[in-house]
Amino acid sequence: MLSKDLENVLKQRLPQSLKELTRDVIDSTKNANSHTRKFMNPERVQRAHEGIRFLTSQNVPMHIAMGIIANGIAENGLSTDAHKHGLGIFQWIGARARQFRNMRANLPGATEFEKQLSFVLHELKTTERAAGVALANARTPEEAARIFMVKFERPKHLNFDVRQGLATGLRNLTSTRQEA
């Protein structure tokens, strides 16, 4: 079930094109630097909306869903088939990659994107429970993005500005659509 906030956002004044939606996300990110802006394109914005829609349908609060999706954009553009240094959207490696492969086989009918987001939710309730608890206490998309990066992803190179900037863009787009 879609959260009412997200459902209202998606129903109100839907943009005429993905290009317009992308421009809205970028323009609404007042503190975005050029590095943050390079992550946004029409396909990623569309995928971001799909991810937020899916996560909120799984009872994830919208601001936390935005933080998670902002990290997925920064990690590899929400690409489900990425294999830079790991597997999938969040570049799982080692035991986490093996666990994902095992779980993926048990989710028939779900899209690959949904399977990967489902695995994130599974990890936040089990092996990454500490990250899940910390994330549940986030109050803004930016805070959720920071917590998810530090406690769940644990990347080699911290890039707070990029991930928090993307979360701000998603939050501002939602606020703009609700006010219209």
How would you name each of these model-derived features?
Residues 5-13, 122-124, 171-174:
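The structured alpha-helical core of multi-pass membrane proteins
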Residues 8, 12-70:
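Export/targeting segments at the very N-terminus of extracytoplasmic proteins
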Residues 29-50, 73-138:
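Peptidoglycan-targeting cell-wall enzymes and recognition modules
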Residues 49, 53, 69, 118, ...:
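Solvent-exposed, polar/charged alpha-helical surfaces in well-ordered, non-transmembrane soluble domains
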Residues 56-57, 72, 112-113, 180:
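Metal- and O2-centered redox machinery and metal/ROS homeostasis
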Residues 63-78, 149:
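Short, functionally critical alpha-helical segments immediately adjacent to catalytic or ligand/cofactor-binding
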Residues 64-68, 88, 116, 143-144:
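Residue-level detector of well-ordered alpha-helical segments, enriched
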Residues 142-180:
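Active-site or metal-binding loop neighborhoods of secreted/extracellular toxin and effector enzymes
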